[in-house]
């Protein structure tokens, strides 16, 4: 019986996309909430968000099977389906992240970093809500289950993204301190 149509690859893809949304927390704190302490950490946050998003989308593309199915998926839209909306949400998030990274790293357009950050923050909330809604509509037969999964995905995004970012920064610091210790001795 095919009550749940997604398998383990889809779960990993959605997890990576949720982490991509959440790992942007540090950049959001620096630009949206104007916390100067987080400014040096923000570009890494946005780059990691892009990397996790591309990883999750690569898993979804591999699940399509033949390469010609990707062309069909990109050119044929059913706008009544939330899956079609997610194509725009995912590609839009990638584009917004590229612009956001550009505004953070280029001094000539640095003044646009805050508006780009606010737009990226809003877009990622919509993206995570859409992803949570898909799961809600697929697995919930009762109305209360559908409504609670979108906020749950936002919470998971905030938690998983922050933890993954912390672990990556911690690993980088451990690696660089080991390299610095090796050079000193």
List each model region and its residues.
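C-terminal ends of transmembrane alpha-helices
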Residues: 1, 57-71, 100-104, 121-148, ...
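Membrane-entry segments of alpha-helical transmembrane domains in multi-pass membrane proteins
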Residues: 2-19, 37-45, 76-92, 115-118, ...
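Membrane helical hairpin/interfacial module
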Residues: 6-68
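Cationic, low-complexity basic patches in intrinsically disordered or flexible, solvent-exposed regions
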Residues: 184
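Membrane-interface helix-loop-helix modules in multi-pass inner-membrane proteins
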Residues: 51-108, 135
């Amino acid at each position: 019986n095919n009550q749940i149509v997604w398998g383990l690859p889809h779960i990993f893809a959605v997890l990576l996309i949720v982490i991509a949304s959440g790992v942007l927390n540090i950049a959001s704190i620096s630009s949206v909430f104007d916390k100067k302490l987080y400014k040096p950490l923000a570009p890494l946050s946005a780059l990691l968000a892009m990397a996790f998003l591309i990883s999750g989308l690569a898993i979804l593309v591999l699940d399509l099977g033949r390469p010609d199915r990707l062309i069909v998926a990109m050119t044929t839209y059913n706008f009544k389906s939330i899956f079609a909306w997610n194509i725009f949400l995912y590609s839009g998030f990638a584009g917004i992240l590229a612009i956001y990274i550009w505004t953070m790293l280029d001094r000539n357009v640095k003044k646009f970093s805050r508006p780009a950050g606010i737009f990226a923050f809003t877009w990622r909330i919509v993206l995570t809500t859409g992803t949570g809604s898909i799961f809600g509509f697929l697995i919930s037969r009762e109305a209360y289950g559908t409504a609670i999964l979108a906020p749950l995905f936002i919470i998971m995004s905030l938690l998983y993204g922050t933890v993954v970012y912390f672990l990556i920064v911690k690993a980088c610091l451990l690696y660089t301190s080991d390299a610095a210790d090796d050079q000193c001795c």
